[in-house]
Every structure is written in C-alpha cells, then in structure tokens.
Amino acid sequence: MPNSHSTQSTPVKNFQNKFLVLTSTPKDFLLLMKPSVMLLAVFTAITGLFIAPNKIHPLLSSIAILCISTGAGAAGAINMWYDADIDSIMKRTRNRPTVTGKIPPSTALTFGIILAFFSVLVMAICVNYISSILLLISISFYIIVYTMWLKRRTAQNIVIGGAAGALPPVIGYSAVTNSIDTTCLMLFLIIFLWTPAHFWTLSLYYTNDYKLANVPILPLVKGINYTKYSILAYTFLTVISASLPYFTDIAGLLYLICSTISGIIFLCYASMLFNDRNNILARKMFKYSIIYLFNIFLYLIIEHCIKHFNIS
C-alpha cells in the first residue's frame, strides 16, 4: 500500500492537520467530492426516478437524490485519499485538495467515511433497503474493487470498475419501485458500455501522465492502435444499447431518432481517432462522450414527460 496512506500521529503532524482543516474552505471539500462525476451520477439517477412506473413522494425522491449525490461524493473523497500519491505525479490531478495540502489525506478519508455511512443509512431509513444496499455496493465497488484493487493492477480496470458508475440510475429506479427489473438494468448497460470508451479517450490524451504514475492504462499495455479499436468497439456497443429503450417500448420514435443522431456523432469521433496522431481529437471525444450520455438520459426524461402529459 502506498506510503501516503499511512497515518502519522506525532504532535506536530496532528497540529498541522488540524490547522489545514481550519483553513480548508467549503469549495475545497466540494472539489474533494468530484462534483463533475457527482453531477452526472445524480442526473442518471434522476432519470431512473423519472422513468420508474410507480410514483414516489417528492420529499422521498429528494432524499434519494441527496443520498445518491452524497454517496458519490463520499466515494470521490476516499478515492482522493487513496490516490494522493499518484495524483501528485499526474498533471491532470496535481491540483486536487489532497495534493495541494488544502485538505489532509486523513481528513479526506474521515470525511468520505462519514458521508458514505450517512448516505446509506438515510437511504435505508427514509427510502427503502434495496436502494440503500445498491448505494452501498456502488460506493464499495468504486473504492475497494476499482480504486484499491484494479486501478494499479490491470488495464481492464475501467471495464470492471465502471460498474460502480453505472449503478446510480438503478438506485434511482429502485428508490421508486423497491425492485430491480430489465428497465433499470438497461440503463445500467448503457453506462457500463459507455464508460470504457469515455475513459480511454482521456487516457490517450494523458498517456504520459499515467506512465509517470505507473498506472497500467490500455494505451500503455496494449498500444495506441489497440486502444482506438477498443474505443470504436465500445462506442458501437454503447450506441446499440442506447437504442434498446425504443425496442422495449420504454421510449418512442422521438427518442430513437435523437439517440441515433447523437450516436452517429459519437461513432464519427471514434472513427476519426485513427487519423488523430497527436490525440487532440481524443480530448474532444472525451468531452463529447459526456454530452452524449447526458443527452441519452435527457431524451428518456423528455419521452417520459411526453407520455405522462399525453403530448402529441
């Protein structure tokens, strides 16, 4: 285990940590929770809430969303605690609060554990046990399976670890239905297949960063071309999976048209990567992949509203 995870109990170190906590700002703690990741998780969870066949009281839905966002933030905080050593090496992550010293790693760990505990507990008490268990699985999977076990050991880390990020819509859906069915599993599948293509485009752009940090990403282990073919394959599978809501009568023709157009653009980006020698386009595809996923889930919400209000 990296040296940064060990705790020092000397009086001087304790005083320094307490002083840093006192000087930490709310913005520092917000950054600790990886707000961009948290927002995407929340939005996909809201989609799960929206398309669920049952109804839930607005207060309970708000509590569920709060628990999901807090749980995602908790996972992000603990991830930053564990990865503080490699984050300090990588250009992309060197400004994280656990690296700059704005928040001591031990404080990040404590903060994350407290958030995780209360998010799961409140979900169990106020919403239902199934959504609470799923939230616990999502947090644990991201921290233990992905961050601590897979990330530094295999280039397939994101393929397996991506399951954690694919759970929020299932949690949102189960918060309403108190069950799991093919509808929410379809949402899970879309995000699960989307995650590798999303992450590998970023890894193409930051290959040197990951090399310095000794993290076995796909471009380093299998090469650039293999990675680009893998991105194309997963992008294709994502686009196909995104059409499933139409063919299972969850969404209508409007959804199919919009998702297909977004999917074609996504595939065009993936195809053009082969002519992207400096990996500049890879970063653009990374940004578009976020827009793509947001749009797919937005289309589902719009379709649900059209059906609910009988808009013709």
Curated annotation (Swiss-Prot):
Any Pfam family matching the protein: UbiA
Pathway: Porphyrin-containing compound metabolism; heme O biosynthesis; heme O from protoheme: step 1/1
Main subcellular localisation: membrane
EC class name: transferase
A Gene Ontology biological process term: heme O biosynthetic process
Keywords: Cell inner membrane, Cell membrane, Heme biosynthesis, Membrane, Transferase, Transmembrane, Transmembrane helix
Enzymatic reactions: heme b + (2E,6E)-farnesyl diphosphate + H2O = Fe(II)-heme o + diphosphate
Residues passing through the membrane, by range: 31-51, 58-78, 107-127, 130-150, 157-177, 184-204, 229-249, 250-270, 286-306
Location of this chain's protein in the cell: Cell inner membrane
Its job: Converts heme B (protoheme IX) to heme O by substitution of the vinyl group on carbon 2 of heme B porphyrin ring with a hydroxyethyl farnesyl side group.
Name of the protein in its database record: Protoheme IX farnesyltransferase
